Amino acid sequence: MRSIAFVLATFVASAPAAAQGWEEYSYPDYAFSVAFPANPQVDTTTYQIADNRSVPARIYSVRQANVVFSMIVAELEGTNLTESAVIDHAIKMLSQSATVRLNIPARIYQVYGRQLTVEGADGSRSMVQLFDYKNRLYQIEAKALPDQNVSNPQSDVVRFHQSLDFTDGGSNRSEEAVRAIREVCRGLVNPAFGAGLDDPACTVR
């Protein structure tokens, strides 16, 4: 799994040691597992996947002090939307009344996507990862609420994001696409660690 520690510097300041009580929750019907600090609330809803178009979705969420940890799984079956269209629209939605400070590739083993840091006009701050995988959009977000002191440790944000796993062992990239990423990232100690063609880690020689 890709390290995301360098993103945390743009998200929260130093804080106390990690809270106890985190547990992994597995959802085999949706091919993922993720850790939460408490039993997540699960809600059914809709998600706007394109302008004037919504799809069924599920939200798994926990609020702990001033941070909301959430996972959205939106159904893409039958939408005929490309990955770039899905991800670009998700970023557009996240950008409403907010500023995207960072937008770089993300990777969880062989599943590739995007990773963002977002600052809301209301003072909130979010760290988000987006993956279009097997006819679903997965959106994982840790959001620090506005006008409150950040009491959750950096390690909790890292723990949440790095706990996400796709449990069916699949990929959303062809072998050719993976080879292209590794070629761009050949300067890394292990080119397989590259997350995308525009991975900033791969541009540093």
List PLM regions with ranges.
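N-terminal signal peptide c-region/cleavage motif recognized by signal peptidases
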Residues: A13-P16
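Hydrophobic helical h-region of N-terminal Sec-dependent signal peptides
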Residues: F6-T10
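Positively charged n-region of N-terminal signal peptides that target proteins for export
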Residues: M1-I4
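Signature of long, low-cysteine stretches enriched in small and polar/charged residues
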Residues: A35-I59, D88-N135
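N-terminal "mature-domain start" segment
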Residues: A18-S54, V100-Q110, V158-E176
